[in-house]
């Protein structure tokens, strides 16, 4: 079911020069912040870091994907709860016009519930985890409907789609001790990658050769080779005893930043065994966005309603600013 709330139609998305940028977004036009605890999406000026406007959404938005041309953002509505405790699950996907900073349309995902993670492929198809129904929804945002569903053996919370659109890797939290591997051409699960203590966040490298899965119970990441779907190595996060949470590659593939507790670890993405640089940020960091020049990372401190700006090369915090109530994730666009 599609409820149109604007007359604008979604045109075919223009593909970027490098398809690997689709789920590693950046830009210079604006900042999009998903204020989960505040029930809003917020638009900031990327130069001044001041808020331009905001939109109230149903409770609660957690994640986003952008169209290839950065005209639209796609935001699933998870519900007012959290993982495994979400008694009023959401069932909508909001389409936001980034230039106009308004809701363009709402796609109803019912009967599927608790949509959480979302990724986009080079054809413009969206892949959305429907946690309570243990499915991946394939959504055509131009048609405004679900075009297919994919069964897999886990609940599914976050997912990572490879840049070439061949496979998706699904993090199953504590529901199953593995990452589900999905063939997106056949829309079938084709394997699993062992994660004995469960999986928190998950991300693919911009070149598609690696997937990073975050250990749910330990300060450790698993490095998955996407050719073999085997774990190449497990890397301990320095300077923390907290479990790993999420990881983000910079769009140029140079850096990998991870979060655990209130710590950020900065890796040289080409050599994850090299010494890490760590620094403390605000409470419960959850999301990271990268500036277009690759120099700055913005860290959403979900636990205290702030965002920390990091000079990546220097591994220092340059400023911390107030933003909403509890930002889960964010991006430049």
Name these PLM-found stretches:
Residues 1-6:
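Bacterial N-terminal signal peptides that target proteins for export
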Residues 12, 16-333:
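Predominantly soluble domains enriched in secretory-pathway, periplasmic, or organellar proteins
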């Amino acid at each position: 079911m599609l409820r149109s709330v604007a007359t604008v139609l979604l045109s075919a998305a223009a593909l970027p020069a490098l398809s690997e940028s689709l789920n590693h977004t950046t830009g210079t036009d604006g900042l999009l912040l998903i204020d989960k605890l505040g029930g809003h999406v917020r638009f900031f000026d990327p130069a001044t870091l001041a808020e331009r406007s905001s939109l109230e959404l149903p409770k609660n938005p957690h994640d986003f994907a952008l169209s290839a041309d950065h005209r639209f953002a796609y935001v699933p509505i998870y519900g007012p709860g959290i993982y495994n405790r979400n008694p009023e699950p959401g069932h909508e996907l909001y389409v936001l016009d980034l230039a106009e900073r308004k809701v363009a349309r709402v796609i109803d995902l019912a009967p599927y519930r608790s949509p959480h993670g979302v990724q986009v492929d080079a054809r413009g198809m969206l892949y959305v985890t429907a946690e309570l129904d243990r499915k991946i929804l394939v959504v055509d945002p131009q048609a405004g409907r679900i075009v297919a569903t994919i069964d897999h053996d886990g609940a599914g919370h976050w997912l990572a789609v490879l840049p070439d659109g061949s496979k998706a890797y699904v993090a199953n939290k504590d529901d199953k001790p593995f990452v589900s591997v999905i063939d997106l051409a056949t829309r079938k699960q084709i394997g699993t990658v062992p994660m004995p203590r469960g999986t928190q966040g998950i991300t693919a490298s911009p070149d598609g050769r690696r997937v990073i899965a975050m250990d749910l119970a330990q300060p450790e990441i698993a490095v998955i080779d996407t050719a073999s779907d085997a774990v190449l190595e497990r890397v301990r996060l320095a300077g923390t005893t907290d479990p790993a949470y999420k990881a983000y590659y910079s769009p140029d593939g140079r850096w990998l930043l991870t979060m655990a507790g209130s710590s950020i670890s900065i890796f040289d993405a080409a050599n994850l065994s090299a010494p890490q640089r760590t620094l403390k940020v605000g409470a419960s960091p959850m999301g990271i966005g990268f500036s277009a020049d690759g120099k700055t990372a913005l860290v959403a401190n979900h636990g205290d309603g702030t965002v920390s700006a990091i000079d990546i090369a220097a591994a220092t915090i340059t400023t911390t600013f107030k933003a909403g109530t509890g930002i889960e994730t964010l991006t430049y666009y």
